[in-house]
Each structure stands twice: as C-alpha cells, then as structure tokens.
Amino acid sequence: YTSFQNTSGKLFTKGYSLKSYTDALKFLDNAIPNTFFIAGTSLILIVLLSIMVAYLVVRRNNFVNKFIDTLSMIPYVIPGSVVGISLVLGFSKKPFVLVGTFSIMIVALVIRRNSYTIRSSVAILQQIPISMEEAAISLGSSKMKAFFAVTMPMMMNGIVSGALLSWISIITELSSGIILYNYRTTTLTIQIYTYVSRGSYGIAAAMATILSLMTALSLMGFMFFSKNKNVMF
C-alpha cells in the first residue's frame, strides 16, 4: 500500500503512483543480481554440505559425526551480527583477506543458513533403509555410486524442502550482511535498510515489495515443482 503512495521527502502525500518503483529500480542495478548470485552460490554450497553431513551422521554414526551434527546447529542460535564481526576479525589479515568480497558474504550465509537443509536431509536419510544401498553394492556398485545413484534420488524430498527454507532465509538476510557488505556487494535487503535509514520510505517500501514478490515466487516455484515431481514439504 505505502509503496504506491506519493512521497515528498520523508512524508507521504496524497495520491498514488508508481514513482517509488521507478525510483527504486534506478538503484537496483547491482542489488538484485548480487542477491541472486550470493544466494544461489550459498545455496549450492549448503546443499553439498548438507548431503555430506547427512551421510556422515546417518551412515557413519560415531561420536565425531554426532559432534559435527550438533556443531552445524550452533550458528542457528548465534546472532548474525556476531557472525559478521567474527568473520571480519578472522578474514581481514593475510593470507586470507576476504573482507569486502562476495566470498565473505557467501561464507556468512552458508554458516548461518545451513541448518534447515542439514536437518531435513538428515531426517529424510534416516527413513531410507541402508539395505537398498547394500543391494546395489552386492550387484557391483561402489559405495559412492550406490549412494548417489540409489539413495540420493530418494533424498530429494528432504533436500528440496530444506533448500527452500534456506533460500528464503538467505534472500531476506540482513544482520550479517550489513556488517560485511561494501558498495560492490550490496544486496536487496541492505538497500532497503539503507533507504529506510535515509528516510526514503517510499523507495524502501517499493524495494520491500519487490523482495516480498521474490519470496512469493520462490514458494510458488516450490509448489509447482513439488506438484510435478512429487516432492513433499
């Protein structure tokens, strides 16, 4: 509603138009592509990490792997600002200088948002009997080939469900990004925060609407995928 209202400085005025959207689009040349690049790269790494952790926890169950499983949940309860500050302190000196790059944004998101996909991947793998892999191995497949050819397709329900939650939380992430970004790595949520702090509420509302639309389209895409591929949430 407010994204369509006319504005004058910090004040909303009478009348409605698309001016806030036209103004917002002028400042989103980098923010939207950056959002998709950072989120997409982070999600790929999260999915790969989740598959590995799920396999270790369920198929190679021991104290070390249980500790890894517990450790993967800790970032979920740590504030994003703490993660951001820790990464700045840890990667601001040689030989690993990542501050101000896309890499440090991606690392922060992988750390903060991997728990959704890990938990759902572990849960779905626990429901798949190991005897199916053993049958494939007895027919001549290696353990790795049996896992990826037999078990992985059956894990897709849990992987996709967790990945959706991770994706939505990634594209709406602010608390760690606001500490780690620079002018080259700004994202849509950071742009929204910037314009709110400047008092440009109309532009901020338009950007927030665009972000909400991106989230809704992600959910719709998941529903379409689940309908056609028999994926359950």
Where are these regions (language model features)?
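Membrane-interfacial helix termini and adjacent extracytoplasmic/periplasmic loops
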Residues: 9-18, 64-65, 81-112, 144, ...
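Cytoplasmic-entry segments and transmembrane alpha-helices of multi-pass inner-membrane transporters
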Residues: 52-87
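Interhelical loop and adjacent transmembrane-helix boundary motif
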Residues: 3-10, 16-30, 171, 177-223, ...
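C-terminal transmembrane helix and the adjacent membrane-cytosol boundary/short C-terminal tail
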Residues: 55-64, 122-132, 137, 141-149, ...
